[in-house]
Swiss-Prot record:
Annotated source species: Rhodopseudomonas palustris (strain BisB5)
Single GO term (MF): DNA binding
Name of the protein in its database record: Integration host factor subunit beta
Domain of life of the native organism: Bacteria
Presence of the UniProt keyword DNA-binding in the record: yes
Length: 101
């Protein structure tokens, strides 16, 4: 599913909202998550999961074509850990679509 499909599904389930408004809301949520991660904050959505940033140190890499050693700079990468409710829902028996609500 891509973002435009997500927006469309949410708009379909909420006919009182315009699709443009749903798109603005989804974009605002994603922007806030990215901004928080850029500040070094952790973003936890209970039942869904938690977003955080992991820092990878500089290291020596290797060019797979030539075999030459190349330096790889340190970098920060986004990390997502699923929440308990999501893991349980994903690991249910096939055919069981009960959402627990």
């Amino acid at each position: 599913m891509i973002k435009s499909e997500l927006v469309q599904r949410i708009a379909e389930h909420n006919p009182h909202l315009y699709q443009r408004d749903v798109e603005n809301i989804v974009n605002a949520i994603l922007d806030e998550i990215v901004d928080a991660l850029a500040r070094g904050d952790r973003v936890e959505l209970r039942g869904f999961g938690a977003f955080s940033v992991k820092h990878r140190p500089a290291r020596a890499g290797r060019n797979p074509r030539t075999g030459a050693h190349v330096p790889v700079d340190q970098k920060s990468v986004p990390f997502f850990k699923t929440g308990k409710e999501m893991r349980e829902r994903l690991n249910r028996e096939p055919g069981n679509t009960d959402t627990g609500a």
